[in-house]
């Protein structure tokens, strides 16, 4: 049962081959048996089965929609009533929210059944899921490797088939990079497309929620429920509702030959994504995927994104600056861990934050406070914002000659657990291909397209697909065409 995609599970429920309760029980058993992966931080079988029973009642009445009764796991950055909501931090280790995040509420309203909360890098700050207060997550493909981050628990859960789908968030690549490392499909929508209400904030001008699942078609189904205007989120964009599945299985242009469904599609290949720093095995795998697109009728077009390298320093000025402000609320008074012993109020603030936050979060708070301080604001923060606008303009220039942009989601396959923990700069460099997309607010996704070579032969590679603003439906169409022609997204780790 767990090998089935969301679409296949929906058909199984409709045909009464299984019930929502049976589905939930099956996945709960798998989660319990795979505790060593550490993908989940909180599971409550009673809450899950109660939701499943309600879904079965809906289905029995002939009601319900496309997602009714289907299980999903939520990244622990989305507050979820009934489950703990920790953001992977000791600071919120015992926090229980009195309300659901909009993303959670919409998926529950669509009839989905929550399996539990997935592990993550603390406050979504990290690229390996080693920064969690609840321990590192292991990659199901190779348990000596990281699953990516910060949505590593979600990517590992979907890869190990502990859940058919999961929510994630992406600030600088935290859906796309773990999707690449774990061999699953994940999409970061256009900034403002999915509500941030109830999503514990890291960097408010960058954070965006999105789905992770086996396939592009599954992600499209989930995005139908997740996306939409929310008046409680000041960054939410008012757009007409759309069906993200509407182009799936359709030719790129009317009249295309069945063997060349993507004829007319122009794929931009940034020179900067294929230069120094890209591992040879990743390059070979991406090249093979691009040849598959050519076989489907697409045309490859060279483009340039000249400020790609600057995306790293720009991101690591802007994101920590916003984080230092957002995380100031966690002081042990109203929110977060409070030190057991302290002398006065100031001492309580110091000790509570020192005990509650992990090393990477402290590092970014310090960086953010520095770049916002008097004398440095103009030199760092304002300059970073100017370059951010240039990066966004570079993408618009590139889209004049192509419909989508493609390249690797990460310069390497997943690295070994502990390999980069002592060198944060090396960890930051792993996001070079995803950061600029986030800075521009564009939609991007990663789809499985093969594996590394040699010692990395069991470590997945993801192809990144980047679209222009609000072009998710076309991006999903392009990804779906690739997945109809290949089976990389159907492959699973040994033993699964």
From Swiss-Prot:
Q: What would be the name of the gene that encodes this protein?
A: gatA
InterPro entries membership: Amidase, Amidase_CS, Amidase_dom, AS_sf, GatA
GO cellular component term of the entry, any: glutamyl-tRNA(Gln) amidotransferase complex
Q: How does it assemble?
A: Heterotrimer of A, B and C subunits.
HAMAP family in alphabetical order: GatA
Q: What is this protein identified as?
A: Glutamyl-tRNA(Gln) amidotransferase subunit A
UniProt EC number: 6.3.5.7
Active site annotated at which positions?
75 (charge relay system), 150 (charge relay system), 174 (acyl-ester intermediate)
The species this protein was found in = Burkholderia cenocepacia (strain ATCC BAA-245 / DSM 16553 / LMG 16656 / NCTC 13227 / J2315 / CF5610) (Burkholderia cepacia (strain J2315))
């Amino acid at each position: 049962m767990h090998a089935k995609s969301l679409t296949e599970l929906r058909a199984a429920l409709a045909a009464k081959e299984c019930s929502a309760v049976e589905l939930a029980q099956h996945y709960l058993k798998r989660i319990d048996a795979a505790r060593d992966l550490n993908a989940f931080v909180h599971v409550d079988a009673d809450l899950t089965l109660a939701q499943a029973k309600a879904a079965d009642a809906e289905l029995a009445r002939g009601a319900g929609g496309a997602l009714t009764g289907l299980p999903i796991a939520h990244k622990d950055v989305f507050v979820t009533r009934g489950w703990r909501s920790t953001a992977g931090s000791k600071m919120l280790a015992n926090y229980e929210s009195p309300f659901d995040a909009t993303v959670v509420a919409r998926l529950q309203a669509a009839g989905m059944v929550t399996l539990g909360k997935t592990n993550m890098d603390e406050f979504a700050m990290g690229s390996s899921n080693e920064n969690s207060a609840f321990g590192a997550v292991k990659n199901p493909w190779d348990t000596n490797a990281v699953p990516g981050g910060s949505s590593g628990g979600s990517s590992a859960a979907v890869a190990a088939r502990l859940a058919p789908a999961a929510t994630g968030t992406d600030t600088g690549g935290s859906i796309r990079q773990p999707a690449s490392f774990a061999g699953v499909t994940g999409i970061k929508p256009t900034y403002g497309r999915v509500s941030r209400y109830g999503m514990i904030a890291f960097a408010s001008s960058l954070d965006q929620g999105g789905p992770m699942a086996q396939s592009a078609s599954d992600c499209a189904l989930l995005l139908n429920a997740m996306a939409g205007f929310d008046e409680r989120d000041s960054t939410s964009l008012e757009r007409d509702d759309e069906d993200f599945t509407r182009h799936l299985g359709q030719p790129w242009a009317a009249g295309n030959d069945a063997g060349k469904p993507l004829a007319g599609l122009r794929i931009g290949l940034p020179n900067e994504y294929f230069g120094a720093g890209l591992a040879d095995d990743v390059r070979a795998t991406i090249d093979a995927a691009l040849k598959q697109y050519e076989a489907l009728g697409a045309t490859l077009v060279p483009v340039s994104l000249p400020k790609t390298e600057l995306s790293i320093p720009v991101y690591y000025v802007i994101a920590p600056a916003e984080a230092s402000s957002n995380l100031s609320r966690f002081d042990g008074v109203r929110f977060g861990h409070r030190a057991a012993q302290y002398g006065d109020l100031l001492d309580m603030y110091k000790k509570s934050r020192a005990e509650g936050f992990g090393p990477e979060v402290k590092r970014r708070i310090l960086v953010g406070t520095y770049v916002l301080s008097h004398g440095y604001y103009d030199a760092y923060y304002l300059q970073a914002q100017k370059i951010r606008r240039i990066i966004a303009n570079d993408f618009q220039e590139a889209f004049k000659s192509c419909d989508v942009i493609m390249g690797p989601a990460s310069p390497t396959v997943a690295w070994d657990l502990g390999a980069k923990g002592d060198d944060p700069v090396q960890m930051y460099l792993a996001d070079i291909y995803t950061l600029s997309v986030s800075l521009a607010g564009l939609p991007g996704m990663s789809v499985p397209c093969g594996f590394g070579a040699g010692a990395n032969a069991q470590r997945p590679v993801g192809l990144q697909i980047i679209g222009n603003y609000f072009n998710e439906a076309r991006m999903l169409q392009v990804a779906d065409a690739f997945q109809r022609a290949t089976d990389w997204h159907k492959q699973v780790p040994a033993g699964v």
